[in-house]
């Protein structure tokens, strides 16, 4: 889990627009962010394996 202080800091409007960055909506993680799901890769994988994200399946070839 991300530090609460850092999540709050990211939610506030930055002095310059360039300083804003994306964070996972579930856990607040700043890295490995997937825009399509608005979550980090770990949360997407966790939900996809449980079948909670419609249309997402594990690849097999």
From Swiss-Prot:
Example GO BP: translation
Record flagged with keyword ATP-binding: no
Keywords: Metal-binding, Ribonucleoprotein, Ribosomal protein, RNA-binding, rRNA-binding, Zinc
Residues binding Zn(2+), per UniProt: 24, 27, 40, 43
Cross-referenced SUPFAM superfamilies: Glucocorticoid receptor-like (DNA-binding domain)
Cofactor, free-text remark: Binds 1 zinc ion per subunit.
Role: Binds 16S rRNA, required for the assembly of 30S particles and may also be responsible for determining the conformation of the 16S rRNA at the A site.
Protein's UniProt name: Small ribosomal subunit protein uS14
Organism: Magnetococcus marinus (strain ATCC BAA-1437 / JCM 17883 / MC-1)
